[in-house]
Amino acid sequence: MDLIWELPRIVKKGRERAEKILNKDYEDPIIQQMIILSDTRNRQDILTEEWINQLYSGDNLIIIEKLLKLGYREKFDLIYIDPPFLTNANYKGRIVIKTNNTKETLEYLAYRDTWEKGFIGYLEMIYIRLFLLKELLSPKGTIYVHLDYRTVHYVKILMDEIFGRENFLNEVIWAYKSGGTSNRYFSRKHDNILVYSKTKDYIFNPQLEKSYNRGLKPYRLKGVEEFQDDIGWYTLVKLKDVWQIDMVGRTSRERVGYDTQKPEKLLERIILTSSDEGSLIGDFFAGSGTTGVIAEKYDRKWIMVDKGGLSLTTINKRLIENQSQSY
């Protein structure tokens, strides 16, 4: 059946399921919540803290429901999600085993990005989650949904319906150099990030970026502050909606070996723009855990969720090495 005819059914079915979840009596499911201590913390510290960051293992739909029932409705100032891209691919993890003087690399399935009902199944999955995530957003909250060319145009239609077209703020283009080339179409070198607020009274702290002068020479205009680096002279201007940020390369310092790891600079821009110190930030497709790392760096609280074994192992290792707060 044509997708255009399926969209109303997806919306109707998703809304009915979401409202059923919101209205039913809550039965606390068995969910694994991890509390792991960094080398600098002890369990007694946890007992005296007012807030403990939370990392959940399991289906994010179940955990979103749990958070709503536990009083987190309208508590999140920022939600960032990086859901699957409908690539119809399976992603692998790798373990290096050292024995004597040899190394052996073992591969295993990290997660699947395949859907039993194809595109329809994907949109059904994302709709109900977006509907319930809106309930978690505070009145000053913003949601960033990280997608690419495969799904962004369809998900925007769903988000217009859920959040209202009037609350659409931006489609941020994350442009990068990495990736393949083609002789059959233009090389695909960007992702799309849809940004919606819950109300008109949302947090927005404008960030600055470098804007290089023509010819890289100083303008020496009155009242304009100029700076110089190895490239040339520049001024600082408010951030635009095209972000030139390199992917996490194979030799990058921050690389943790997770295929779809997002760069810290990307999350830094999002978190500093759309949250304040003390804000609660959520990531319900946590992946490599970059959201939590950057949230903590800038004194934000976080809750992250993922069901992948590789994701949870990666996040635990990363946060422990980062000497993170208890979670």
Where do the PLM segments sit?
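DnaQ-like (DEDDh/DEDDy) 3′-5′ exonuclease domain used for proofreading
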Residues: 1-132, 140, 144, 150, ...
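Conserved S-adenosyl-L-methionine
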Residues: 3, 263-327
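Glycine-rich helix-loop-beta junction characteristic of Rossmann-like nucleotide cofactor-binding loops
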Residues: 69-72, 135-136, 270-276
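Local beta-strand N-terminus motif with an aromatic residue
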Residues: 75-77, 168, 278
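Short glycine-dipeptide loop
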Residues: 132, 137-143, 277-278, 298
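Conserved Class I S-adenosyl-L-methionine
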Residues: 153-174
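Flexible, glycine-/basic-rich loop-and-beta segments that form/coincide
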Residues: 176-248, 252
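Conserved SAM-binding loop and adjacent beta-strand
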Residues: 252-266
